[in-house]
């Protein structure tokens, strides 16, 4: 496991031994559940990235409106190859490319080929820090390749002073202190609230409390979506150096 400590939080990613359009994956059925546990599972993906270490880096993410996969930037920064797969037990991995990245907020968007991951159902992105202390919802974490829905509770809204993902500049990152136990490989998991709303992205475990984590809010996602609109999803972008 690789860890980086900054601003009182512990960023952890797992190192594993190596062994978008309306007619694409975002086409929603006429009736869908709005329960957070159900909608989180229907949008979740397991992410594997290679190229920065001898072993894979593992993370999580979720499909959002616009057929983009939302995740944490430090999971995919510098990667030569990225694959994603849905939470379905029989799902196969497909290639993904980074189309937008924000190293300050620790957020990234991925795209896959049109027609892939058609089983996913997108989440709506909430603007800004819409959650409040006591709010609850669900995230999907992957354990030994299996998707597990885990409830969360927001402890409070926070602005964390932390280094960017490349440890070059201190930034103020708005988001949430979240009551949830996470482990290596959970970075990028998307917090899902009622009515299919994505409200945050987990990026770090608390150093002080095992059952506490930190998440960026989704206030910067609209800007990432706008940036991605100018990118060829078949090519992607340069994601910078490994972290």
Task: Locate each region found by the language model.
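Bacterial N-terminal signal peptides that target proteins for export
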Residues: 1-9
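C-terminal motif of bacterial Sec signal peptides marking the signal peptidase cleavage site
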Residues: 16-19
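Bacterial signal peptide processing site
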Residues: 21-23
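A conserved glycine-rich beta-strand in the N-terminal activation segment of trypsin-fold
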Residues: 28-33, 44-66, 72, 92-95, ...
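Short Gly/Pro-enriched turn/cap motifs at secondary-structure boundaries
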Residues: 35, 98-100, 179-182
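Active-site region of chymotrypsin-like
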Residues: 39-50, 113-121, 148-242
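A residue-level detector for short acidic-glycine micro-motifs
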Residues: 63-65, 98-100, 141, 156-158, ...
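Conserved active-site neighborhood of the chymotrypsin/trypsin-like protease fold
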Residues: 67-149
């Amino acid at each position: 496991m690789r860890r980086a400590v900054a601003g009182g939080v512990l960023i952890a990613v797992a190192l594993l031994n190596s062994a978008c359009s309306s007619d694409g994956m975002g086409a929603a059925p006429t009736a869908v559940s709005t329960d957070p546990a159900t909608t989180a599972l229907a949008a979740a993906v397991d992410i594997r990235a290679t190229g920065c270490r001898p072993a894979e880096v593992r993370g999580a993410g979720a499909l959002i409106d616009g057929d983009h996969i939302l995740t944490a930037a430090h999971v995919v920064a510098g990667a030569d190859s990225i694959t994603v797969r849905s939470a379905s037990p029989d799902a196969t991995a497909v290639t993904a490319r980074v189309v937008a990245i924000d190293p300050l907020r620790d957020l990234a968007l991925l795209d896959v080929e049109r027609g892939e991951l058609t089983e996913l159902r997108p989440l709506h992105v909430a603007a800004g820090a819409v959650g409040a202390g006591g709010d609850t919802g669900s995230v999907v974490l992957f354990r030994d390749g299996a998707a597990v829905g885990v409830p969360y509770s927001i402890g409070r809204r926070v602005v964390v002073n932390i280094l960017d993902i490349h440890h070059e500049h201190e930034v103020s990152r708005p988001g949430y202190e979240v009551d949830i136990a996470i482990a290596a490989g959970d970075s990028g998991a998307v917090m899902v609230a009622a009515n299919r709303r994505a409200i945050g992205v987990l990026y770090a475990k608390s150093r002080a409390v095992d059952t506490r984590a930190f998440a960026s809010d989704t206030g910067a996602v609209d800007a990432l979506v706008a940036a991605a609109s100018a990118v060829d999803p078949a090519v992607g972008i340069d994601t910078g150096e490994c972290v």
